[in-house]
Amino acid sequence: MSGIASACLSCLSTVDRWCHITACLGPIGGRSRDGIYETTLADNEREAVSDLLGYLENRAETDFFRGEPLSALSTLVYSDNVDLQRSASLTFAEITERDVREVDRDTLEPILFLLQSSDIEVQRAASAALGNLAVNADNKVLIVALGGLAPLIRQMMSPNVEVQCNAVGCITNLATHEDNKAKIARSGALGPLIRLAKSKDMRVQRNATGALLNMTHSDDNRQQLVNAGAIPVLVQLLSSSDVDVQYYCTTALSNIAVDASNRKRLAQTESRLVQSLVHLMDSSTPKVQCQAALALRNLASDEKYQLEIVRAKGLPPLLRLLQSSYLPLILSAVACIRNISIHPLNESPIIDAGFLKPLVDLLGSTDNEEIQCHAISTLRNLAASSDRNKELVLQAGAVQKCKDLVLKVPLSVQSEMTAAIAVLALSDELKPHLLNLGVFDVLIPLTESESIEVQGNSAAALGNLSSKVGDYSIFVRDWADPNGGIHGYLKRFLASGDPTFQHIAIWTLLQLLESEDKRLISYIAKSDDVVHMVKSISDKNIESDEEDQEDGEGEVIALARRCLEFLGNGPRQTLVEA
């Protein structure tokens, strides 16, 4: 962010500053052309001027940040002579532009002193020097610690545009350091920054909006910014003709929209916000497009915005970004469409807008874990509410792509993929198609995953597929293989001791027993380990006053007893009256 200030800090470079400084110092240090001393100086000042002229002649070999050169500069700084102060401030501005390094308080204190001058030229050059030094991380902290904010805030309120610009640019640089952000927020700087964000001077506007952006990276600072009235200004500036201003404001609003309370305020007061962001997704500048999509993503954490983005015709530009070749654009777009897809009323509009095939393609066209997660999560959301949409997701190749990739992708992606298959497996019409695609080849091994989520999702998919499927020949075929087959999965989950896993396994077992497939039932009946564990579960006692357990474990016990009834082993009555 340090580059934000460059437009203003370079304002002095329109002249050869070294020549300008020397020209200023020359008449002070010696005689004018007519032989008359134009300025009366104290001896130490005259000596300092003479020394400084010598240092400037050998500036390439001179370190102005310590020793005699700094001492000579400091003498000029603390002089009552404004010409000397001007020369000192110009020298500091020049040397800090070509040599930025960590400095100590002996260097910073003279510059901070110059900031308090009433002379515009001194203010302008001193703030330029301070802004240059504020590129260094250690200097940022020390400038604030030495009280640099107060004079910078005063300079932001200067009527001189150049002074404003340099002061805001310096605060922008200071605000990039985490240690400074809360101090800046409490310093009284936010009000002037918000006012200067509306400046007619584009350099000032850029620096001010950049500073506001830097203040949006923590909850407390965002709240102070919102309370200071930043939101209407940031929203208004989305229509700026300047790309940098667009970017800073879009990113700032994206950060502000992270907080639910701020989204509520935006919804109440900024009716044009969504339309402006949708428009910016068609910007010719990728970084603006990216931040516009991310801002919409954050807004779409709320149901109201999920619907509003679709109504504002946000889907076509999102689809274009999704099909971009630029990874950050793809990521921002797919993250946004994922949130929008959460609303059931958006499922069909998103499908009808042509998102299915590009989303499926993203699963295999990138190894970016975040993009893959968002893409498959979106596909799962789109399939959630209707069998029609589930079928369209299947036809788009989502299940085949998941089957091809799921054993190779990271655990987070595996979790999303298995969850998506589980949702699709809820459709009775699609179950035979899923089985014929060979999903057991991946679901059964994944019930042994190191991830509890992947295990649970895979088992849930197997359970959904086991209900009312009609033809159970694949269950018979895969009873023992792969990876121990259905038998091995049931055994592991029943033995897990986890009530949720036991519930899934026993419910699945009951569906298989209800299948009326004699071979399958025979396999189950001969599986002594499974039958023994089901009996153990069915024999558990549940006290009638243990209401919390009755809801979960009690249901598992009831399912276990039903399984035993199918196997010809009726349960014993074990419920104890209180």
Curated annotation (Swiss-Prot):
ARM repeats lie at residues 58-95, 96-135, 137-176, 178-217, 219-258, 262-301, 303-342, 344-384, 428-467. Signal peptide: none annotated. One of its GO terms (biological process) is piecemeal microautophagy of the nucleus. Transmembrane segments: none annotated. Pfam families: Arm (PF00514). SMART domains: ARM. GO terms for molecular function: identical protein binding; protein-membrane adaptor activity. Gene3D superfamilies: Leucine-rich Repeat Variant. It comes from the Eukaryota. Keywords: Lipoprotein, Membrane, Repeat, Vacuole. It is a lipid-anchor. GO terms for cellular component: fungal-type vacuole membrane; membrane raft; Myo2p-Vac17p-Vac8p transport complex; nuclear membrane; nucleus-vacuole junction; phagophore assembly site. It is found in: Vacuole membrane. Belongs to the beta-catenin family. Functions in both vacuole inheritance and protein targeting from the cytoplasm to vacuole. This is Vacuolar protein 8. It comes from Aspergillus oryzae (strain ATCC 42149 / RIB 40).
